[in-house]
């Protein structure tokens, strides 16, 4: 992938950009093998490659510059701004959207937040696209509600120019820290969510919902999880840290008893909408802490699927699973190091198979899916 920002030394977020892509995959696979001792892994499946450019469905842009000439991109530690509207990780059709939004910022008088002076209102722009429908969600992250009225007054013109923006909101983040978003969300559109679809499974995305930024890889990951689970012929499962339900909905059929647990109530609303659309009546989704939910139960399903944040599932949940011994654990991780630590704590299990998904090309990061099977002896 060619990148003018990288070549000019303005952005080195893609640390491995100069490394041939085949070598990137090889190095990631080698890293995974070093973390999981080969003696306990029955089957190493080949890594799944990504598109090398234009693969992202989401842009997280720091807003800087002036209200008349805003910049969308990133800030270096010294305060230098870099406009990344032409970043090759984004699809080409994002660029005209950025151009219109820049004009809108000027029209609405949304003064970019100045970190050094702690002045201004507009901190970030978050743009997300459904590859299924082409719909987009645009979120303005503001320091306060001061500019809400004038932002809302200017929106009809933005809708006219960009009808694909079906969900528009403002997020209020008043803290002077590098925190992407706050708790309060103000919706300007009747539509609260847009629909993505992977492998025939509808997934609904709302402003606060976490969603993978590489849809092709997410689709492959979910499909693989579904295929592995169907081969096991199980009838009951938990989907812990379930987000909007992508894993569980790919694994369950009408006869599967599935409980999905996620701390975000907004994500759970999305998961419930998907289950309703699919007509899955034996599924329930609850907005709870996944670990607290699990350890309070004295019975466990045949399979427990976990997709934790980078910190892993942790000692408490590992101890519980070791005690309750479900037949299978399906572990999806964005941090193989913490996954390996958790697997080491699950001494009653062997690794049946593992597969790497290159969710983050040109970086050292990747996603990995691992099936653990209980050693009955």
Swiss-Prot record:
Keywords: 4Fe-4S, Iron, Iron-sulfur, Metal-binding, Methyltransferase, rRNA processing, S-adenosyl-L-methionine, Transferase. S-adenosyl-L-methionine binds at residues 212, 241, 262, 307. The keyword S-adenosyl-L-methionine applies. The keyword Zinc-finger does not apply. [4Fe-4S] cluster binds at residues 3, 11, 14, 87. GO terms for biological process: rRNA base methylation. InterPro entries: 23SrRNA_MeTrfase_RlmC (IPR011825), MeTrfase_TrmA_AS (IPR030390), MeTrfase_TrmA_CS (IPR030391), SAM-dependent_MTases_sf (IPR029063), U5_MeTrfase_fam (IPR010280). GO terms for molecular function: 4 iron, 4 sulfur cluster binding; iron ion binding; rRNA (uridine-C5-)-methyltransferase activity. It catalyses: uridine(747) in 23S rRNA + S-adenosyl-L-methionine = 5-methyluridine(747) in 23S rRNA + S-adenosyl-L-homocysteine + H(+). Its EC number is 2.1.1.189. The active site is at residue 334. Transmembrane segments: none annotated. Catalyzes the formation of 5-methyl-uridine at position 747 (m5U747) in 23S rRNA. Belongs to the class I-like SAM-binding methyltransferase superfamily. RNA M5U methyltransferase family. RlmC subfamily. This is 23S rRNA (uracil(747)-C(5))-methyltransferase RlmC.
């Amino acid at each position: 992938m060619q990148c003018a920002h990288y070549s000019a030394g303005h952005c080195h977020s893609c640390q491995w950009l100069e490394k041939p892509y085949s070598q990137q995959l090889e190095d990631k696979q080698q890293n995974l093998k070093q973390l999981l001792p080969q003696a306990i892994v029955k089957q190493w499946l080949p890594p799944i490659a990504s598109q090398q450019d234009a693969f992202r469905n989401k842009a997280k842009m720091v807003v800087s510059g002036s209200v008349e000439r805003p910049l969308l991109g990133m800030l270096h530690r010294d305060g230098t701004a870099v406009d990344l509207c032409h970043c090759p990780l984004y699809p080409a059709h994002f660029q005209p959207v950025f151009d219109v939004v820049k004009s809108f910022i000027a029209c609405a008088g949304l003064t970019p937040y100045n970190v050094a002076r702690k002045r201004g209102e507009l901190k970030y722009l978050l743009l997300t696209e459904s590859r299924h429908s082409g719909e987009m969600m645009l979120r303005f992250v503001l320091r306060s509600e001061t500019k809400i009225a004038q932002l809302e007054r200017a929106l009809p013109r933005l809708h006219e120019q960009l009808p694909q923006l079906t969900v528009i909101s403002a997020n209020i983040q008043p803290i002077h820290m590098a925190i992407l978003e706050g708790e309060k969300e103000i919706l300007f559109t009747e539509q609260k969510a847009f629909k993505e679809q992977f492998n025939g499974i509808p997934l609904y995305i709302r402003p606060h919902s976490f969603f993978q930024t590489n849809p092709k890889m997410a689709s492959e990951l979910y499909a693989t999880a579904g295929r592995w689970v169907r081969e096991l012929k199980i009838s009951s499962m938990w989907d812990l840290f379930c987000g909007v339900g992508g894993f569980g909905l790919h694994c369950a059929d009408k006869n599967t008893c599935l409980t999905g647990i996620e701390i975000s109530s907004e994500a759970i609303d999305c998961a419930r909408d998907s289950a309703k659309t699919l007509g899955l009546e034996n599924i329930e989704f609850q907005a709870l802490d996944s670990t607290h939910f699990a350890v309070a139960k004295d019975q466990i399903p045949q399979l427990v699927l976990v997709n934790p944040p980078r910190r892993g599932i942790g000692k408490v949940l590992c101890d519980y699973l070791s005690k309750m011994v479900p037949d299978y654990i399906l572990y999806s991780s964005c941090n193989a190091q913490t996954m390996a630590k958790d697997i080491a704590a699950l001494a009653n299990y062997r690794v049946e198979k593992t597969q790497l998904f290159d969710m983050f090309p040109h970086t050292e990061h990747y996603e990995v899916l691992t099936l653990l099977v209980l050693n009955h002896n």
